[in-house]
Amino acid sequence: MSNFAIXLAAGKGTRMKSDLPKVLHKVAGIPMLEYVXRSVGAIXPXKTVTVVGHKAELVEEVLTGQTEFVTQSEQLGTGHAVMMTEPILEGLSGHTLVIAGDTPLITGESLKNLIDFHINHKNVATILTAETDNPFGYGRIVRNDNAEXLRIVEQKDATDFEKQIKEINTGTYVFDNERLFEALKNINTNNAQGEYYITDVIGIFRETGEKVGAYTLKDFDESLGVNDRVALATAESVMRRRINHKHMVNGVSFVNPEATYIDIDVEIAPEVQIEANVTLKGQTKIGAETVLTNGTYVVDSTIGAGAVITNSMIEESSVADGVTVGPYAHIRPNSSLGAQVHIGNFVEVKGSSIGENTKAGHLTYIGNCEVGSNVNFGAGTITVNYDGKNKYKTVIGDNVFVGSNSTIIAPVXLGDNSLVGAGSTITKDVPADAIAIGRGRQINKDEYATRLPHHPKNQ
C-alpha cells in the first residue's frame, strides 16, 4: 500500500508577531516547513499535499515542485485543514501521515518508525506521542487500564486530572487513508475553540472499536512545535547542536561548539579546525584542513583545502586551496581567489577574480578587477571603479607590481610584468614590461622650513 502525507501550513502564527507566515521562519538557515518536507521524504510518499492559507503564495514558493497544494481559506482547525485535501486523497488506499509545518526538529527516521509501527500493528490510526515533565499547552494522551490510547484531550478541554498526564500529543499522526476521510465527516465544533479537531477522529475510531495505537518518540526535542519566538530560539539551539555534532563525528574540530553557528546545508570536509564565534551560512563548502579563526563569517561560498581564514567575512565567493585571508578582510560577492593568494588585514575585494600567488597584504580595495597571477599590491592601493553612475573594470596582468598608495582609475589595463611607482594615479593603460609613474616630482626648498612658526629658530 502507498504512503501519503499532509503538511499543515495554513496558519498565520499570531504569537510570532510577524508578517511572515510562521512556517517560513528559518531555523539554521532554512524555513521550518522545508525541514518537515525533507523529513517526510523518508516515508517515500506517493502523494504529498500541503495545506496553505495565510500568504499562501510565499509558502508555495518554498515547496514548489515538492508537493501539491490546497487552500484553507478559513482557519477552522486541524480537522478542517485535513478536510481540504479530500479532492486529492479521498478514496485512495494507503497510510496517510498528517504533520504540522512548524515541527522542524522531527526526523525522517522517527517518521519512518511511526509508519512502520502503524503498519506492523495494523492500526487504523497511530498517534505520535512524547513524554515531558511540563506538558502545559499540549493535548494529553488518555489511555485505559490496558495502556491503549483512548482519546486526545486538548489543554483547554482537559479536566484537572487529565492535565496531570505527562504523555502528550505531538500533532503528528498516521491514519488509514480511506477511514480518515470517512471519519472526518462526523466531527463537529463542540469544543472550547469552536474548531474541527483532527484529534476527534481518534475518539470516533475508538467508539467503533477500531484499533488506535501510539508510538512514543525517544527524543522529546523532536516534538517541539514552534508557536513563538521563544520556541523558535529553542529549535535553533537544538538544531545547531545536531549540526555541530554531525560534523564533529565526521572529523571536524570545534574549539567551542556552543558558540559556533553552522547552517544545515553547509558542507565541511574532515580535519577542518573551527574556532569560536564562527558563522557558516547557506550553501557554504569548506575544504579539508582549512582553519577558520574566531569571528569568521562565511555565506554561500566555497573555500578550498588548507586555507586559513582569520576573523574575516566572505560572501558568495570562491576561495581556492591554500589561500590566506585576514584578519579583518572582506571578500564581497562574485569574487574568486586563486590558489595561494594572500588577502591581508583591512583589504576588501568585490566582484573580482584574482590569480594564483597574488598578494594584497594590507589596506587595499580591489573592485571589479581581473587580476593575474603573482601580482603584488602595495599598502594603500585603491582601484577606482565608480564614477558616480557606472562601474568600470580594471585588468591587471601577471607579475605586476603596484607600489604603495597607488590609485588605479578604471577602465584601465596594466600589462604583464609592469610596475606602478608608489603614490601614482594611473588613468591610462600601462604596456607590458613598462614602469608607470603618475605623480608630481619632488621639490626641495632649502631653508624654507625656518620660516615656519613651529621651527625651533622661531620659538
Swiss-Prot record:
It is an enzyme of class 2 (transferase). Its EC number is 2.7.7.23, 2.3.1.157. Its cofactor is Mg(2+). Keywords: Acyltransferase, Cell shape, Cell wall biogenesis/degradation, Cytoplasm, Magnesium, Metal-binding, Multifunctional enzyme, Nucleotidyltransferase, Peptidoglycan synthesis, Repeat, Transferase. The active site is at H362 (proton acceptor). Binds 1 Mg(2+) ion per subunit. This is Bifunctional protein GlmU. The gene is glmU.
